[in-house]
Amino acid sequence: MQTSSRTYDYRRLKAEYKQLSASSSTDKAMHRLREAVHAVNILLPTPITLEMALLSADGVRKLVRGQSLARTYSACLRNLECLSRHVPGRGNPGLDAVVETHRENAQRVADTCAAALLHMYMSIGTGRTDAFVEHAIQLTAATETAMSDIALVERALGLTHPHNERSPASMDESTGMKNCAVLSHMNDNKDDAVNMEPGYNTTIDRLISSPLLSQSKRERTIISTPAVTPKDNCPPVKFSRENNLITEL
């Protein structure tokens, strides 16, 4: 009987509940935010604080974007460090060109990430570039980055690379205009005359629009046209902007 009474008394005890602390989840979130701020500050000339990053929801979203760009930038630096250990001329001869191509692509992606992050935090009126930054993050976060799209990002950010500027010969080959006169793109000025004779330089004006530019600007490219040989059977022409006529010489 004594045993049963003890059991009965034990069952009548009130259940006690202990409130679990939510500090563990909060600490994890704060740790991730501090990591993001640290990653972004590596690329910023003027570091930001955690309080500055958490002032608004837009600030938090900007911090997430910046961390994504900073991580991709760090990955590119690690790839460049590994590729720098390659010594040209040793081992497989065909490996040198592949390593050089990967090195150029990694450097371009790293420069693009750094420029996008700097523009996002250091420029004025960054609300206009939200869509552009999202696009840049999607490009750089892809497993196989399309370098043609990176070229568009470079142009929008104002980055210049020597390999982006094609020579006149390569432009003639890409457009299929070998040993023939090139017709220039007409602009608004109709008083200028463009000499399209072979052996002369041709000026082409292109209108460039970018979300980062307050207004469109023109880019001028000079193309050298090769001389025409008799076998080409392509007569020289001269284009005049006054009457919009093409006449054979």
From Swiss-Prot:
Gene Ontology CC terms: host cell Golgi apparatus; viral tegument
Localization per Swiss-Prot or TrEMBL: Virion tegument; Host cytoplasm; Host Golgi apparatus
A matching Pfam family: Herpes_UL51
Modification note: Phosphorylated.
Predominant place of localization: virion
Keywords from the UniProt entry: Host cytoplasm, Host Golgi apparatus, Phosphoprotein, Virion, Virion tegument
Keyword Membrane: no
Family per record: Belongs to the herpesviridae UL51 family.
Physiological role: Plays several roles during the time course of infection, including egress of virus particles from the perinuclear space and secondary envelopment of cytoplasmic capsids that bud into specific trans-Golgi network (TGN)-derived membranes.
Protein name according to UniProt: Tegument protein UL51 homolog
Record lineage: Viruses, Duplodnaviria, Heunggongvirae, Peploviricota, Herviviricetes
